[in-house]
A protein has these predicted regions:
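Bacterial N-terminal signal peptides
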Residues: 9-17
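Bacterial N-terminal signal peptides that target proteins for export
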Residues: 1-8
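Beta-strand-enriched cores of mature, soluble protein domains
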Residues: 23-166
Length: 166
């Protein structure tokens, strides 16, 4: 059974994610000598509240599993986990997440891991979603890049993935 603070953190996180805008991202700080590519498309996401560890039980954090299906230039599924926190100040929250993506990117098959670290300060969101270095496998070995998630007012999710491959 979920505790009330977990339900509150989960509900506030969902409102945080719904306020995400594509322009609110952290730029890539590394320069990649390879040619850059951009993949775009919609995706579906299922989130499910999970029980926190005993250590974090009274921390005010919320924990959720992520199950995504990407469409478009990235045809893939992903599975991951997220921790979220919402402060007492309305519109201020943050989350971190890790997800392993498995599928094809512009026809190249493999897996890679995305790392999320995003915040919202009094309603102003800032996203950072990057490929974990050296996490690409098979035809995606050497993948580097960042993803931007956009959530339309009706809740439809889409992505823009700027990446490089050797």
């Amino acid at each position: 059974m979920m505790r009330p603070h977990t339900l509150v953190a989960t509900a506030l996180f969902l409102s945080f994610v719904a306020g995400a805008r594509a322009a609110d991202t952290v730029p890539i700080t590394q320069e990649h000598p390879m040619t850059s590519h951009t993949a775009t498309g919609p995706f579906d996401v299922k989130r499910a509240p999970q029980t926190l560890s005993g250590v974090a039980e009274h921390s005010g954090l919320g924990r959720m599993s992520l199950d995504k299906q990407f469409h478009g230039a990235l045809e893939a599924t992903s599975a991951g986990e997220m921790l979220a926190f919402s402060s007492a100040t309305p519109g201020s929250a943050g989350y971190v997440a890790m997800e392993r993506v498995h599928g094809t990117l512009d026809g190249r098959a493999g897996t890679f891991v995305l790392q999320h670290s995003s915040t919202m300060t009094r309603g102003e969101p800032l996203q950072s979603i990057t490929v974990v270095p050296d996490s690409g496998t098979d035809a995606l070995a050497g993948l580097a890049g960042r993803m931007v998630v956009d959530i339309a007012p009706g809740g439809a999710h889409s992505y823009r993935f700027e990446y490089t491959l050797p």
